């Protein structure tokens, strides 16, 4: 190459450099622009190396040496820029794809959770829930503070449904839920908010958040759920049904089994109602104002399992063994039902877990089995296998740990006094929002139980290299086999179980652990011993 040709070559390289620069400005517009920029950068680099590979006429010229080094630096920089922008664009596309997949997954889970048959009714019911703050309540409770957390959830009565079964009434009583104020009578209220003043962050004292239910119209329909194969329960159920019909003029709905038993006993009970198929059972929440359970905690679990969506308030009478969720004494059922039917009364909102099984053969995470709602816990154990359970656990896509032991318990706070407690988990107040993560006989001295916030999603997966299978059970029933590659997804359901309180949520909880578990029961120390 002659010196006369050198300016033309340099001019061509500048043109190539300008072309690369113009392509760099268009990289963010899409993957095609990214590819074009990358190709242009590679061609520019190749041309620069071809030019530098030729023997210059005056190799000792300092300007040519400096120009050669500058061109090499430019070529490397252009290559790094093109590669960096291409990688950034690819990463952005991957995050966008993950976001769209997650949103589609959540929508699919919501649709499956509601059930295709009851979807229209649930949407109608959700549209009737309005959040209000009455002016009278705000002025009477909060004074002049200006901010009030005394919002109430008002449930308007749904209109009659022409598709409903003729065996069930079509109108439901309306009610309101409101926060309690610790029984304060002085007009002062402790707000639940975080303030920022003068550079300091402070949390105001919270009220005890007791939830009160007040009927706006009289309850018309009561559903009875009873413990089977118990003569004392059967006798009490017949007595309560007769009393509600004769003294309260209330419609009574019972299970098909109970209906058959009562009608066999006496034709007087011809007025009771029941359901014939699963379609009618799915619509119970739109007809029933109140649920009365006669039995123990297992009866409450069974009653909750009948409702895959909203659950009416539950009044649980103790006719079982321990009774953590059954505070009402059966001997005083008249007074108890009078107080509940007249209102207002305290309730405990007990969260439920929504569980999905994703099989390894599924094409994507949208292909899940029918969701299962649990009130106490979901247990994953090794079943009859002689090998340790091997589970990989994730929390919102973050790796938590690998479980090697007899299994794992994922529990609600209501279930903290059940299997989780026996496995070493802590007892937690049922209105504390959280998910308990409790191992079963872990093969590790440092594996302690966890309590996670209620908004997380847990994923428990049996890895492909696991030596054995695992079994999942939901509130002690509906066991499902989890083969290597299968996963279980757990999150808090939007539909809690509201249980009526005898006194209030905290008093009932403390009474249950004292009377049911004899918590911290020991002989008191003698006062006449040695002293300091």
Curated annotation (Swiss-Prot):
Known EC number: 2.7.1.23
A biological process term (GO) from this entry: NAD metabolic process
Bias kind Basic and acidic residues: ranges: 1-26
Enzyme class: transferase
Tagged with keyword Isomerase: no
Keywords: ATP-binding, Kinase, NAD, NADP, Nucleotide-binding, Transferase
Catalytic activity: NAD(+) + ATP = ADP + NADP(+) + H(+)
Domain of life: Eukaryota
Family according to the record: Belongs to the NAD kinase family.
Protein name, per record: Probable NAD kinase 1
Annotated source species: Oryza sativa subsp. japonica
């Amino acid at each position: 190459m002659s010196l006369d040709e050198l300016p033309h070559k340099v001019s061509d390289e500048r043109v190539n450099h300008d072309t690369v620069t113009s392509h760099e400005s268009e990289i963010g517009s899409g993957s095609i622009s990214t590819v074009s920029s990358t190709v242009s950068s590679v061609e520019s680099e190749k041309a620069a190396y071809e030019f530098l590979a030729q023997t210059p006429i005056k190799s000792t010229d300092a300007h040519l040496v400096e120009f050669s080094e500058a061109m090499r630096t430019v070529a490397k920089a252009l290559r790094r820029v093109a590669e960096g922008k291409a990688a950034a664009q690819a990463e952005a596309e991957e995050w966008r794809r993950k976001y769209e997949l997650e949103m589609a997954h959540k929508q699919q889970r919501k649709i499956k959770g509601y059930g295709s048959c009851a979807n229209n009714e649930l949407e109608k019911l959700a549209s009737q829930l309005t959040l209000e703050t009455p002016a009278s309540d705000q002025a009477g409770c909060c004074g002049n503070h200006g901010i009030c957390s005394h919002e109430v959830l008002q449930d308007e009565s749904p209109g009659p449904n022409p598709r409903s079964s003729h065996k069930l009434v079509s109108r439901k009583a309306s009610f309101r839920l409101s926060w309690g104020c610790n029984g304060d009578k002085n007009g002062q209220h402790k707000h639940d908010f975080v303030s920022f003043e003068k550079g300091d962050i402070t949390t105001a004292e919270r009220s005890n958040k007791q939830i009160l239910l007040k009927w706006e119209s009289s309850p018309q329909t009561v559903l009875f759920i009873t413990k089977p194969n118990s003569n004392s329960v059967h006798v009490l159920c017949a007595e309560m049904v007769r009393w509600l019909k004769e003294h309260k003029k209330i419609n009574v709905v019972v299970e098909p089994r109970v209906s058959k038993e009562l009608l066999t006993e006496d034709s007087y009970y011809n007025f009771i109602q029941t359901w014939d198929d699963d379609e009618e059972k799915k619509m119970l929440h739109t007809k029933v104002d109140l649920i009365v359970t006669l039995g123990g905690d297992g009866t409450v679990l069974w009653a909750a399992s009948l409702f895959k969506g909203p659950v009416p308030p539950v009044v649980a009478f103790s006719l079982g063994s321990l009774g953590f969720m059954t505070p009402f004494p059966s001997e005083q059922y008249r007074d108890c039902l009078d107080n509940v039917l007249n209102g207002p009364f305290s309730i405990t909102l007990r969260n439920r877990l929504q569980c999905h099984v994703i099989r390894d053969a599924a094409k994507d995470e949208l292909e899940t089995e029918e969701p299962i709602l649990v009130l106490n816990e979901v247990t994953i154990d090794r079943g009859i296998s002689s090998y340790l359970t091997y589970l990989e656990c994730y929390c919102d896509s973050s790796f938590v740990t690998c479980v090697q032991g007899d299994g794992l318990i994922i529990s609600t706070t209501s279930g903290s006094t059940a299997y989780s407690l026996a496995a070493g988990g802590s007892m937690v107040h049922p209105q504390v929002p959280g998910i308990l993560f409790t191992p079963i006989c872990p093969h590790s001295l440092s594996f302690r139980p966890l309590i996670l916030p209620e908004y997380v999603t847990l994923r428990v997966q049996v890895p492909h290299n696991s030596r054995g299978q695992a079994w999942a059970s939901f509130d002690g029933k509906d066991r499902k086999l989890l083969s290597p590659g299968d996963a279980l997804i757990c999150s808090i359901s939007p539909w809690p179980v509201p249980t009526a309180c005898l006194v209030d949520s905290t008093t009932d909880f403390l009474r249950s652990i004292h009377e049911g578990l004899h918590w911290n029961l020991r002989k008191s120390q003698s006062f006449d011993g040695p002293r300091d």
